[in-house]
Amino acid sequence: MGNYLSVNDTDRKLMLEKIGTSDLMELYRDVPADLILKEPLSLPEGKAEMQVRKFMRQLSAENKVYPVIFRGAGAYRHYIPAIVDQVASKETFLTAYTPYQPEISQGILQSIFEYQTMICELTGMDVSNATVYDGATAAAEAAAMCRDRRRNTVLVSEAVNPETIEVVKTYCWAAGTKVVMVPASAGVTDIGALRDLINAETAAVLIQNPNYFGCLEHAEEIVEVTHGAKAKVIMSVDPIAAAILKTPREYGADIAVGEGQPLGMPLSYGGPYLGFMAATKEMMRKLPGRIVGETTDDRGNKAYVLTLQAREQHIRREKASSNICSNEALCALRAAVYMAAMGRNGMREAASQCVSKAHYLQKQLEEAGFTRKYEGEFFHEFVTDSPYPAAQVNAVLDKHDILGGLELPDGSILWCVTECNTKEEIDRMVSILKEELA
């Protein structure tokens, strides 16, 4: 069995001479000294491929794969039609990067264009980009789109996913943009607090609908208050919920963002996912990343091109609207195939099942002594107060290979149901809780 031959000292010397230096550390001169490794990493001796494969199998076997899941909080188990994997695994698509001459790859560009078209239909917006890294990144990029010299403050609802909030804060910190949190009350954004906090320096207000607690926001009222202060509304949405709810544009949002993982991406231990972004025509030139457009070639045939490239880093460098470079085209392809395979009726059916099954679980949990924490409408997630410690509830379910809801900081539990959960699974879980926690 062959061995991997790494770069040796002679190779390093030749490469350094080629670029005109003899000191490897010269290449790291811009890296702060305290971040540079002082000694080589202490690594074990190399192993043969067969030994490595055996070790990796043993390591992966330590993961617990749950056949039944009642947890969401940003990553959701939805059914993925077989055609999604079949198309995405084709060697013509299965690549990490768009070719350097993208117009040569009309198939890839067409798939991205169709993805953009369907995202616009789903959100009601005028234009979509070719995705960013994930939903949190999309929200942060949207915040960056809205700021200008006069307006450099972003208001973020406390009902937004906490991980999204952290990413937005990081982006805004680097850009010198101020982030102000808007309190949540009764599981939704506090409109009164929003009125008190918004001012002439506010660039945008970020909300999530349905929000982190599963509740539907009073979106129209939030939009009215925000636009009254001449600020922009960024609405983070669940793409499955968007199939049956009003679109962000119908609510009056200026930018729609969200986590695209439910659109054909497996949970996959957190990634790769995709962040979708769509906006009104007025915001189009501030959208980050690639945008594919449709045109005609010199023979009059339909053709696809990368358009509005003056926004991108390979044209404007440090003045670009974004520095997204690693391509999410494969994830966008999966999302496009998923939406095309499901169709309008299929996505509405999946969303409707999410709603009905989640409400069924809520009623069953109430019979088991759990109480819903927040009133109002919800999609497929909701929060309950538990008569037992949340950790104990999940420990009991774990023994039966069921992943329970997410324990929140106040001890309540955030539950999630999708079309993949059956009535039998719900009844079994509730029965286990009644029997073993009584």
Predicted regions and their residues:
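Gly-rich Lys/Arg/Thr-decorated short loops/hinges at beta-loop-alpha junctions or inter-strand turns
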Residues: 91-102, 118-124, 150-151, 172-180, ...
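Conserved PLP-enzyme active-site core in the AAT-like
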Residues: 15, 137-300, 368-369, 373, ...
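Short loop-beta-helix segment that forms the pyridoxal 5′-phosphate
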Residues: 100-104, 120-140
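Conserved C-terminal alpha-helix-loop-beta "cap" of PLP-dependent enzymes
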Residues: 345-428
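N-terminal entrance/gating region of PLP-dependent enzymes' catalytic architecture
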Residues: 36-113
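Compact, charge-rich alpha-helical regulatory domains located at protein termini
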Residues: 1-25, 29-35
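Active-site C-terminal subdomain of aminotransferase-like
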Residues: 263-368, 372-375
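Buried hydrophobic packing segments
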Residues: 116-119, 138-146, 335-339
